[in-house]
A protein has these predicted regions:
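Short loop/helix-cap segments at secondary-structure boundaries that form the rim of catalytic
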Residues: 32-33, 87
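A short, hydrophobic beta-strand-centered structural micro-motif
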Residues: 33-43
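Charged, amphipathic alpha-helical segments and their flanking helix caps
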Residues: 1-23, 41-124
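A short beta-turn/loop motif at secondary-structure boundaries
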Residues: 28-32, 107
Length: 124
């Protein structure tokens, strides 16, 4: 399994522990009740060295909700749940760092918390 695929599986499992989320999806769902999270961990670049393969994976998590106060609390819970990720198949998670977090809203749509992380992983 690719580093991004393994990481996405681990993140989905961790976000499943956030009780107020109605679902965690690999990309935007066609229909879902708020609040929910969509995640993407498919952008990978080389982070290897002489004796081991490695990957840097960019992780984008978007939490959608129609209530901004609850959205901020959910974004905090998402960050907290990613501090102790479960083991990833075939990869060792070396670092998982927050890159950026912002809250956005389309005039005609719901609120979104876009949370971006950078993960560095080594093959085991």
């Amino acid at each position: 399994m690719s580093a991004g695929g393994a990481l996405q599986t681990a993140i989905a499992a961790a976000l499943g522990n956030v009780p107020d989320l109605t679902g965690v999806f690999d990309g935007p769902p066609a229909r879902a009740a708020y609040p929910y999270a969509a995640l993407d961990a498919t952008t990978e670049s080389d982070w290897g060295h002489k004796s081991s393969d490695g990957r840097e994976v960019l992780v984008a998590i978007t939490v959608w909700d129609d209530q901004p106060v609850r959205l901020h609390a959910l974004a905090d819970q998402v960050e907290a749940n990613l501090q102790a990720l479960p083991a990833t198949e075939g990869w060792q998670l070396v670092t998982m760092r927050l890159v950026r977090r912002r809250v956005l809203r389309d005039v005609a749509g719901p609120w979104a918390a876009a949370i971006d992380f950078r993960a560095r992983m080594l093959a085991v």
